[in-house]
């Protein structure tokens, strides 16, 4: 394969959920800059329109629709819209949408449990399931789940959130094996604290940021573009032999054990 084709998404199609903020927006822009035609969604029409106008002004080929990914019939409508936009074929599915409620396990309500599960896990499973025919029809498919290091190690971000992310990590491995014969690769990206709206309130607290940084070997919080670059790579032809992997983007957090500088 020619080098330029290995590092290009020209002619490819992509669906990115939750693409108007944070990591999702960075992924939309990254894929579009590599040449992909992208469709994304948001629950907020005004926010979506503002993004679409901005992308158009910057020469990026992006379309969009309103969708609450936690609602089953809206997910089905989203896939129908993507199918119509891309003539029944989809090369890339990025399951990015997510939410969280931070509180002790004993304080969660059944409604909060259902909301986090339906948004983070059920949406990703169902969208992958109903997008499968489109991914298979494209001849070369790639799914990327946006998980979290909370699915790998304990964080105080909440047990339900961690459970959904751990499930995504295993779903990645299962689909990678089950759908390999359909030429669909499945991978997962697990970020640590990234500057997004999901955690912006936390990152406004100096003591919290200092605690995060103290456990992060690279000594800082991550940027959305540092996640989207890996997501894009996992969709490129250059990554064609990579599947079933859960890759942390965490500044070294998950490999940081105990260290203590001994005084002479």
From Swiss-Prot:
What InterPro entries does the annotation carry?
NAD(P)-bd_dom_sf, Sc_DH/Rdtase_CS, SDR_fam, TR
What organism does the record attribute this protein to? Arabidopsis thaliana
- Lineage, highest ranks first: Eukaryota, Viridiplantae, Streptophyta, Embryophyta, Tracheophyta
Pfam families with a match to the protein in the record: adh_short_C2
Question: Which amino acids does the record list as binding substrate?
Answer: 148
Which residues carry out catalysis?
161
Q: Which family does it belong to?
A: Belongs to the short-chain dehydrogenases/reductases (SDR) family. SDR65C subfamily.
Q: Which NCBIfam families match?
A: PRK07231.1, PRK09242.1
- The record's EC number reads 1.1.1.-
Protein name as it appears in the record? Tropinone reductase homolog At5g06060
């Amino acid at each position: 394969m020619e080098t330029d084709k290995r590092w290009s998404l020209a002619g490819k199609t992509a669906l990115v959920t939750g693409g108007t903020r944070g990591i999702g927006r960075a992924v939309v822009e990254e894929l579009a800059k590599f040449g992909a035609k992208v469709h994304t969604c948001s629950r907020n029409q005004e926010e979506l329109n503002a993004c679409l106008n901005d992308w158009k002004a910057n020469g990026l080929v992006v379309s969009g629709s309103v969708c609450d990914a936690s609602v089953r019939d809206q997910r089905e409508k989203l896939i129908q819209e993507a199918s119509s936009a891309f003539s029944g074929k989809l090369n890339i599915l990025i399951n990015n949408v997510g939410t969280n409620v931070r509180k002790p396990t004993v304080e969660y309500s059944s409604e909060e449990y259902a909301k986090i599960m339906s948004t983070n896990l059920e949406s990703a499973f169902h969208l992958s399931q109903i997008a499968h025919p489109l991914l298979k029809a494209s001849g070369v498919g790639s799914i990327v789940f946006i998980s979290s290091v909370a699915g790998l190690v304990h964080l105080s971000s909440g047990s339900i959130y961690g459970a959904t992310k751990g499930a995504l990590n295993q779903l990645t491995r299962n689909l990678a094996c089950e759908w390999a014969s359909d030429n669909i690769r499945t991978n997962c990206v697990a970020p640590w604290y990234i500057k997004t709206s999901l955690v912006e309130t936390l990152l406004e607290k100096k003591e919290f940021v200092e605690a995060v940084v103290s456990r992060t070997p690279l000594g800082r919080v991550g940027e959305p573009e540092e996640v989207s670059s890996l997501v894009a790579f996992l969709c490129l032809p250059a990554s064609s032999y990579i599947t079933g992997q859960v890759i942390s983007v965490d500044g070294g957090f998950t490999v940081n054990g105990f260290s203590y500088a001994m005084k002479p």
